[in-house]
Amino acid sequence: MLDYLVLYQSGSGNTKKIAASIFSRLPGNSKDLIDIDTDKTIPEANVYFIGFCVHRGSCSMEVSDFLSDLSGKQIALFGTCGMGDSPDIAGRVSAWIEADNDYLGYFICQGKMPQKVRMKYESMRTNENNDQIDRFIQNFDLALTHPDNLDVEHAKVFVDHMLKKIQL
């Protein structure tokens, strides 16, 4: 059994970048970094860092199914979201964690979105929602550089905080 498993799902590469940062910060050699969509058997670990990309305010069914199957583990969540961090997201995802696990905390940073999202925003524009669409497009444009170096550093600080809570 591994000490640490960094398991992630990444549609655009954003969450994969944060996963690699988290993995590099974990001590020792008893660790692995795996895409949840792998065909390989996912090994057991004492501590799971589980990453996801946010779609419609939560994680995918693959991630929620994996979370709900864990028992007696220490779990930290991380993710990327085009709209940025929101405690609501972490709450919705952590709800899949069974009570016999130790939920350590979460880290979410902004991630770039596909160009089709910007095009969808533009197609939704009306006189009534013009200001709201402007804010969505402004956020989209700000997200283009994320996750950036500062996000990566914040992910490492997150790991440092989680390591203080972890019992191996």
Protein language model regions, located:
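Short acidic low-complexity segments
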Residues: 32-44
